[in-house]
Design a protein with these regions (language model features):
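Structured core elements
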Residues: 12, 35, 141-143, 177, ...
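Cofactor-binding active-site loop characterized by glycine-rich and histidine/acidic residues
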Residues: 6-136, 154-160, 165, 170-172
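Short, well-ordered secondary-structure micro-motifs
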Residues: 47, 125, 152-155, 187-189, ...
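Glycine/aspartate-rich loop-and-adjacent alpha/beta segment that forms the canonical ThDP
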Residues: 196-224
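Short gly/pro/ser/thr-enriched loop/turn and capping motifs at secondary-structure boundaries
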Residues: 42, 148-151, 212-214
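Flexible, glycine/charged-enriched surface loops at secondary-structure junctions
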Residues: 1, 112, 201-205
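Short acidic (Asp/Glu) and glycine-rich catalytic loops that position anionic groups and cofactors
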Residues: 2, 31-36, 145-146, 167-174, ...
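Ligand/cofactor pocket segment of small-molecule handling proteins
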Residues: 135-138, 145-203
Length: 224
């Protein structure tokens, strides 16, 4: 379909990372908040969004989640707690913190989950977000889908630490690393993080080490 020219723009597939979205979203209620990424199709499916509307949106059709105007990278489905995916690297952290703050102020027992990639951890928005979440003990779970490459750059090119979860320590935040290819590991780690958040014990950074079976996007030469 993509190569037939039926999908406008870029297409970032989630093939290989399904255990992360599934393991995380199995712990969430319908009204819990999720902020997604440019590679968000799996998050939307796992959170309960209509797969036909997702497909329609990817193809730019009026019957899509955003009436075909958002496309593959910019979808939203508030009825299912999905407050947007974004093509901006690190762009999901600020709204995820805002949603977590709203949940705390409203005593709603909701949690806010922010999916992100390994490359986005170097963005200033990550550090600002996790710092505020720690100071205010917000019900925020940052799920870092570490597929070992920030587009074409391997992790050792842009981060000294072996486990990204270690970076949470500098903010007094609990960090944990799990095998992102194992749905049971992801589920267990996320359950603990969600339970802590609902008890008012603050944020958690969950790093899921996974691997992307395709290139960064459809048509990627994968020269790296």
């Amino acid at each position: 379909t993509f190569y037939e020219g039926k999908v406008p723009g870029f297409l970032h597939l989630y093939v290989g990372e399904e255990a992360v979205a599934s393991g995380v979203c199995l712990n969430l209620n319908k009204d819990d908040y999720v902020i997604s990424t440019h590679r968000g199709h799996g998050h939307f499916i796992a959170k309960g969004s209509d797969i036909k509307k997702i497909a329609a949106e990817i193809m730019g059709k009026e019957t899509g989640l955003c009436h075909g105007r958002g496309g593959s990278m910019h979808m939203i489905d508030i009825d299912n707690g999905l407050y947007g995916s974004t093509g901006i690297v690190g762009g999901g952290f600020p709204p995820a913190v805002g949603l977590a703050l709203a949940a705390k102020k409203n005593n709603s027992n909701q949690v806010s989950v922010c999916f992100c990639g390994d490359g986005s951890i170097n963005e200033g928005s990550f550090h600002e977000a996790i710092n505020l979440a720690a100071i205010w003990d917000l019900p925020l779970i940052i799920v870092c889908e570490n597929n070992l490459y920030a587009q074409s750059a391997p992790q050792e090119y842009h981060q000294k630490v072996k486990d990204i979860s270690e970076r949470a320590k500098g903010y007094g935040v609990r960090g944990i690393t799990v095998g992102g290819m194992d749905i049971f590991e992801v589920y267990s780690a996320t359950k603990d993080a969600v339970d802590r958040a609902r008890r008012g014990e603050g944020p958690t950074l969950v790093e899921c080490k996974t691997y992307l079976f395709s290139g960064h996007y459809v048509g990627d030469s994968k020269a790296y």
